[in-house]
Each structure stands twice: as C-alpha cells, then as structure tokens.
A protein has these predicted regions:
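Conserved G/P- and acidic residue-centered "switch" motifs that form tight phosphate/ATP-binding loops
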Residues: 81, 116, 145
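Conserved acetyl-CoA-binding loop-helix of GNAT-fold acetyltransferases
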Residues: 105-108, 114-127, 150-154
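Charged catalytic carboxylate motif
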Residues: 16, 121, 147
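Conserved GNAT acetyl-CoA-binding A-motif
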Residues: 129-140
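Conserved beta-strand-loop-alpha-helix junction that forms the acyl-donor binding cleft
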Residues: 113, 139-149
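Structural motif
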Residues: 132, 154-155
Length: 189
C-alpha cells in the first residue's frame, strides 16, 4: 500500500487523466470513480470537467446547488507516477445517494487489472471517507461482478441486500462497510 497514494485531480495531470479515460473507452470498460471527469467523452473540455469536478467536492457548493458532494481521487503508483485507478466518495447533501451507486465508486484502468490494486484503491478511499466524517459507507456492484464482490468482502463489506436495478435490469448487491473498523483491521494490506 505504501507504493500508492490518492491525489486530487488537477490541470497538471490533464494528459494523464485523458489517457486514463481514453483507455477505459478503448476497452469498452465501465467508467467508475472518475465519472465527472469522463464528461470529456461528451464533448466538454477538460478544463470544464475539472472545474465541475472540483466544485462538486465542495460541501457548500453541493448544498447550495442541491447536489451530492463528490470527492474524486486518482490512484497513483509511486514507482512510475502513473494513474492506475480512480475513486470517488459521494456524500448526501441534496438529491440523495442512489442506492445502486452507493457512497463509493472506484475502478482500475484495464491494463492494470488483476494486480490487487483495487483493494488498495478502496482502502485508501476508506481513509478519505473517514476524514469526511463517514462512519459507514454503502457500495454497490452487480451480483455477477465476482472481482468487486471479493474486494468489498475482503475489506469487511457485509451484504445488506440484493435488488434489481431498474436502470439496467441487473441484480445488484448492496454492501455496507464500517469505515473505522475496516481501517483498523486491514491497515497492513
């Protein structure tokens, strides 16, 4: 875990972020953890998406605009300074948290998968969630996503219930993680 850290997106990472998003698109991969910045795929400029991303991480802005606060982070590998993943933490101040999204969304770029990085990504995200005052978080994943299920459960996630997501018709598992308990129990991952 000491080989990775989370970083708030910035203009200095513009090319790296665009490369990360393009890789997700190239592999037809779901865009998780970096949705606000992925608006570049809809024709918005990087600068516009970055500005919106940073605004959405501000509690006052979220409350004023009736939106959820969304804090987005990039998972950086220290050895080569490469973005290998992303995670966002959603706090409810306005429109409510969609139970099929949960408090946390996260993902790893396709060329870096199956290396154990997403467990580190989620753990570091839980550290940020604790700083934001979250005691428990909900995470959602499709019931067929075995990799995500294993990651969530390996960090103490407890299946709360499963339900059909009306947006896509897929059975979705909703998990709860006790933030402090998980941080203390798994700090040596």
């Amino acid at each position: 875990m000491n080989n990775f850290y989370l970083e708030i997106p910035s203009i200095k990472r513009k090319e790296d972020i665009i490369d990360y998003i393009n890789e997700l698109e190239q592999y037809n991969s779901e865009i998780n953890g970096i949705e606000l910045l992925a608006k570049i795929l809809d024709g918005y400029s990087f600068e516009e998406t970055l500005e919106n991303c940073l605004k959405r991480s501000n509690k006052e802005y979220a409350i004023k605009n009736g939106k959820n606060q969304v804090n987005t982070y990039l998972l950086i590998r220290k050895s080569d300074n490469k973005i290998v993943g992303a995670i966002n933490i959603r706090l409810n101040y306005g429109s409510g948290i969609n139970k099929f999204n949960g408090n946390i969304g996260y993902g790893i770029r396709p060329t870096e998968r199956r290396k154990g990085y997403n467990k580190i990504n989620l753990y570091l995200g839980l550290l940020e969630a604790e700083k934001l005052g979250l005691e428990k978080v909900t995470l959602a994943c499709e019931s067929t996503n075995i990799a995500s299920i294993k990651i969530i459960e390996s960090l103490g996630g407890i299946l709360n219930y499963s339900e059909i997501d009306p947006s896509d018709g897929n059975l979705t598992n909703i998990y709860i993680i006790n933030v402090k308990e998980t941080i203390n129990k798994y700090k040596n991952i």
